[in-house]
């Protein structure tokens, strides 16, 4: 039996060990930014990425692009949301993210490169002892975020005036397929929507192709929309 192993061991020795080491945890910055800017969080030594959401006709409805340092800080982040007519482009400058066009200071940071304050909207963020954003608050609303032991976002609860909106996500039990999940949305404890996502993954356990099904249960009959998500990811 030992002799049968020798050719395999020799091959490994000659070719080197180039297997990708899979990182199962999410950094506080990646998890928290994904919550605030509404994209799927990624794992491992991500250098840059583009995440594109397309409808059933193949039309782009949303695109998020980011570049990260080797330490995991977002050097730049760009969000294009065609459905909500929103464009955001931020670049890192010391303790702030500036508008990429006007260079106006938009987001103040705390710690290494975590969200702290959005002065123009009067929003401030709080973190836990591990650096994850767990609360966001302003005069109009309060938000609380939840994560699992690997830092995967499990949802959030938003309270504003007399309304409470809660999103609860349940990821796959397979730690490699964390972005295979279901989620339920409640408005004042009444179910108004659900989501199901399934993906194909790369060697870093990050999604490359996903199908996202969103069901709006707040209307009768319920309306189902099917989206495709494409990820292009470069690593260090």
UniProtKB/Swiss-Prot annotation:
Disulfide pairings: none
Chain residues carrying a lipid of type N-palmitoyl cysteine: 17
InterPro entries per the UniProt record, alphabetical: UPF0257
Keyword Cell membrane: yes
Location in or out of the cell: Cell membrane
Annotated membrane topology: Lipid-anchor
Signal sequence region: 1-16
PROSITE patterns from the UniProt entry: PROKAR_LIPOPROTEIN
UniProt entry keywords in alphabetical sequence: Cell membrane, Lipoprotein, Membrane, Palmitate, Signal
Covalent lipid adducts (S-diacylglycerol cysteine), residues: 17
GO cellular component, one term: plasma membrane
The UniProt record lists the keyword RNA-binding: no
UniProt record similarity statement: Belongs to the UPF0257 family.
HAMAP family: UPF0257
Name listed for the protein in its UniProt record: UPF0257 lipoprotein YnfC
Organism from which the protein derives: Escherichia coli O7:K1 (strain IAI39 / ExPEC)
Gene this protein is translated from: ynfC
